Regions:
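Active-site proximal loop and beta-alpha junction motif in alpha/beta enzyme cores
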Residues: 1-74, 80-276
Length: 276
């Protein structure tokens, strides 16, 4: 057995008990995929990441991202949390203020912007309106009439997200999903807040197995690409997520030079070693 540096960080909130936690194992090149998957099941967090030496010369570090159910090619809050952990451990990017992460979807750029880290949203792998059978499953899951869905789209950037927009944030917050109807879908739901709220939209993320993700970077990335691209959201806005779970997070979205950036605060909560 070997010991590895370990940190647990909180992403998308300055509150250590808000946002979405992430477990990070550093310098994990010696671990097998089986060991990584087993440790991710043990932590039972939405994601656990393993920092590795990059194989791509353009990357500062590599990361593998695991949920308790398996590996993901990309996820948003693990990208920001892993980057924060790498920097806090003394990582030095090749280019000041810009960090390049290697993961399952290739290279992802991360920038340091004051108290925030922000990643460049990866290209969408699937777009377009949702199929009738998918919409039928969603309305059954959410317990709403088809007319309650004002817009819908595939926003898949790796995890497989589909998304619907409701007419208000209050509708989003009132949802009590029928988990048995969701099936294999990974569903994002978004609705606008009233003027004067510190966030423009409320977001919720529903995943099969009865799980609601507290704050989801990949989903918010896909939502921003869709909504900004269609003129349904301003080029810069803040999304709130986790409210229904009392884990309020804030995700900062902006479009610059044709690219969508997804940012938020990250704080370290636990530091130590793990023996595996």
């Amino acid at each position: 057995m070997s010991s590895f540096r370990f940190t647990q960080v909180n992403v998308f909130s300055a509150d250590p008990l808000g946002g979405n936690p992430l477990a990070v194992v550093h310098a994990a090149d010696a671990l097998s995929e089986t060991q990584m998957a087993a440790f991710a099941r043990w932590t039972n967090l939405s994601e656990t990441t393993f920092l590795l030496s990059p194989s791509d010369p353009g990357a500062d570090y590599a990361v593998r991202i695991f949920t308790p159910g398996g590996e993901l090619p990309f996820a948003g809050h693990p990208t920001l949390g892993s980057c924060h952990a790498w920097l806090a451990a003394g990582g030095q990017p090749r280019q000041p203020g810009r960090i390049v992460q290697q993961c399952g979807v290739g290279l992802v750029s991360v920038r340091s912007d004051g108290p925030h880290l922000a990643f460049m949203a990866p290209p969408l792998l699937r777009t377009g309106g949702l199929e009738p059978e998918v919409l039928s499953r969603i309305t059954q899951t959410l317990g709403v009439q088809p007319s309650a869905i004002v817009h819908h789209e595939w926003v898949d950037n790796g995890p497989g997200w589909c998304a619907v927009m409701l007419s208000s944030a209050s509708q989003v917050l009132s949802l009590k999903p029928d988990w048995s109807a969701l099936g294999p879908l990974k569903l994002g739901v978004i609705g606008p807040h009233d003027p004067g709220h510190d966030a423009a939209f409320e977001v919720r993320a529903f995943i099969s197995g009865g799980y609601e993700d507290p704050v989801t970077g990949s989903l918010n990335a896909g939502l921003a690409q869709w909504l900004i691209g269609r003129g349904l959201a301003p080029r810069s806005y803040v999304a709130s997520q986790g409210t229904a779970l009392q884990r309020v997070g804030r995700v900062h979205l902006c479009q610059a030079d044709g690219q969508v950036w997804v940012g938020g605060e990250v704080v370290e909560v636990i530091r130590g070693e793990v023996t595996l």
